[in-house]
Amino acid sequence: MERIFHLKENGTSVKTEILAGLTTFMTMAYIIALNPNLLTNFAVGTPLWNGVFLATCIASAIGTVVMAFLANKPFVMAPGMGLNSFFAVIAGNVAAMLNTDYTSAFQAVLCIILVEGIVFLLLSVFNIRDKIVHAIPLGVRLGIGPAIGLMLMNIGLGSNVGIYAEGNGYTSPFYVMRDFFGAMTPSVIKDHMGAEYSQMVLTVITMFIGLFVIILLAKKGVKAAVLVGMLVASVIYWAGCFIFLGTNPFASLEGASFLPPFHDMVETTLFKFDFADFFNIGWFTAISLIITFCMIDMFDTIGTLVGTASRAGMTDKDGNMPNMKEALLSDAVGTVAGACCGTSTVTTFVESASGVEAGGRTGLTSLTAAFMFLACMFIAPVAAVIPAAATSSALIYVGILMLQGLKNVDFDDLDQVVPVFLMLLAMPISGSIGHGIGIAMISYTVIKVFSGRAKEVSILTYVISLLFIIKFFAVV
């Protein structure tokens, strides 16, 4: 282990790395069930769903193992959120345009992912992606971590537990707080929300308990604070389901199959590239889609690597991460593997930050998570019972910690402050790391040009900004 991962050199141990790997896996285990749901339009139990489920586990493991041994970094990969939703939308449009079934359209769009992965492999081998990283201004790089932190908190508070999501005029605590006249009392909200009210209350309370447990343990120097906090939150949530909701949180385990559906994967997704339908969608559309996938994936990955590495102290004084080329190459291999297995773009997950916060510093963290993905081919029903409240407590805590990176931003320099501020707004709102970086890059370039300092901006920075402008306003 020492010879492969250099544990002592990185100030860590086997125990710490394994706990960090488990922590990262638990915070992103939701992707195992959610990815096939999104890519198949929730066609649960169908051959395509089973194939995508296995593809998710296998492709995530392959990409993460490559990251572990090639880059020796504690980053974990899986099919990217946002990218998978975009994939599903495109597949649906292709099915309608070509008047074909969804599975055939799905296999046509897989060709786009394959081409994207091959392009990334070439860009990584020839150091072009590394040069793109260096073309991102220092101020923007310093703000990526805090912006990701806000996005993690937004996921934890909004998407996972819905603490401020509004629906039907009645909802969660944050919206009740704005009711200055007291009309929206708990009893009124309960009457309108029905059974969902108790579910919401249990989820929110459990999330905060998990968060406070993590904070208290972290203050005491417990390295497994995030993992323990998630376990405590899970137990409390399960107990609450039994006691207060009268439901069985483990009901999904009854009659569940623990055997991987390899036959369905071979029949529907494994190397199932439908190039005939791919060429039928038109060259302009195909190229536009490939460029869109490439840009989103590239800057999502770069942002995650830079932001998480900065939080872990893995960057130099200029904000650059050693072995960036190897990390980007691992990401490209993951995307190609994902396309071959039958899933959307595989990318580095922002949830890797939770493992880093738990002490993960080497590829052993990644290797641990990779083994868990492979194990989930057999224990997927078990992974699915991890409540959103437990995941949210970890995401919010890590997001808070990542905000500390703002102290490195020079607030006296508007060239840094304005792009960082816009990125802090854009990233959680859009839910895309790449879009946040794009807005920051465009604003940085515009400020430099109109302040008479255009020569301070590199040619590659201009090119990237122009590509983002095209992406936002020209490519549909």
What label would you give each PLM region?
Residues 36, 40, 68, 72-76, ...:
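Transmembrane helix-loop junctions in multipass membrane proteins, especially transporters and channels
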Residues 37-51, 91-108, 280-286, 387, ...:
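Helix-coil boundary and interhelical linker segments in multi-pass alpha-helical membrane proteins
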Residues 22-29, 62-65, 69, 153, ...:
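Hydrophobic/aromatic residues within the transmembrane alpha-helices of Major Facilitator Superfamily
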Residues 59-81:
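Juxtamembrane transmembrane-helix boundary signature
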Residues 1-35, 59-60, 80-89, 93-145, ...:
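Helix-loop-helix junctions within the multi-pass membrane cores of secondary transporters/permeases
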Residues 95, 102-232, 367-476:
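Membrane-embedded alpha-helical modules
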Residues 1-53, 192-194, 230-324, 468-470:
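Helix-loop-helix hairpins and the membrane-proximal interhelical loops
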Residues 11, 15, 209, 287-291, ...:
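Alpha-helical membrane-protein architecture signal
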